[in-house]
A protein has these predicted regions:
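Active-site metal-binding core of divalent-cation-utilizing nuclease and nuclease-like domains
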Residues: 21-82, 93-96
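Amphipathic coiled-coil/heptad-repeat helices and related helical stalk/stem segments
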Residues: 67, 100, 128-129
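Mg2+/Mn2+-dependent nuclease catalytic core
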Residues: 81, 85-111
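Short, surface-exposed amphipathic charged segments that create phosphate/polyanion-binding patches used
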Residues: 154-161
Length: 161
C-alpha cells in the first residue's frame, strides 16, 4: 500500500471529516508519482486516493501551524493529532520508520497534542513498530497504527498500553 493510500484509509476510518474532524493532508510530488522512478500502477492509485481525500473534505496542503506534517486532524472533542505516514516504497522500512519518528519528534513542542505513526497493515511494518518501546511511546504520547482498506488497528505494543 502506497503512502497516499495509507493516508486515505486512515482519514476514512480514524479521522472522518463527516464526524467533525478538520483534516489537513500534505502530499508531496513523490506520493503522486511525479519525478523519480515508480511502479506502473502508482500514479493511478495515488490519483484515486487523493480524489477520495478531496471528496471527504480534506484540506490538501501544509497545515498553518504544523507545516508539512503528513496529516493534522483536529476535533473539538477528541483533540489534535499530528500524524506521520509511511507506505511501501523502494526505501527500507526501518529507514522509513526512523525518518517518520524524527519528523514527529521535530513537531513536538510540549503542547498537549497526540502524535501518531501510521503504516500499512502488514507483518513487516508491524515488526518495525515493535522496535519502539512502550516507554518511548508513553513518553512521546505516540500511538502506532496499522492501516488497510478494511480499517485501522493499533499494533500489538500500542494495544497493550
Amino acid at each position: 500500500m502506497y503512502q497516499l493510500e495509507v493516508k486515505r484509509w486512515l482519514v476514512t476510518y480514524r479521522f472522518p471529516p463527516s464526524e467533525g474532524w478538520i483534516v489537513h493532508c500534505d502530499i508531496d510530488a513523490m506520493e503522486r508519482a511525479n519525478g523519480g522512478q515508480h511502479k506502473p500502477d502508482k500514479a493511478e492509485r495515488a490519483r484515486i486516493a487523493e480524489a477520495s481525500l478531496r471528496e471527504m473534505g480534506v484540506k490538501i496542503g501544509p497545515h498553518p501551524l504544523f507545516g508539512r506534517a503528513d496529516i493534522v486532524a483536529e476535533h473539538p472533542s477528541h483533540g489534535l493529532f499530528v500524524v506521520e505516514v509511511e507506505g511501501d516504497s523502494s526505501r527500507q522500512k526501518e529507514q522509513a520508520l526512523y525518518s517518520a519518528l524524527g519528523q514527529l519528534v521535530l513537531q513536538m513542542d510540549g503542547s498537549l497534542h497526540a502524535f501518531m505513526l501510521a503504516v500499512p497493515d502488514e507483518p513487516a511494518w508491524e515488526r518495525q513498530f515493535l522496535k519502539i518501546s512502550p516507554y518511548a511511546r508513553s513518553l512521546l504520547k505516540m500511538t502506532c497504527v496499522l492501516v488497510s482498506a478494511n480499517g485501522v488497528r493499533q499494533d500489538i505494543a500500542s494495544a497493550g498500553r
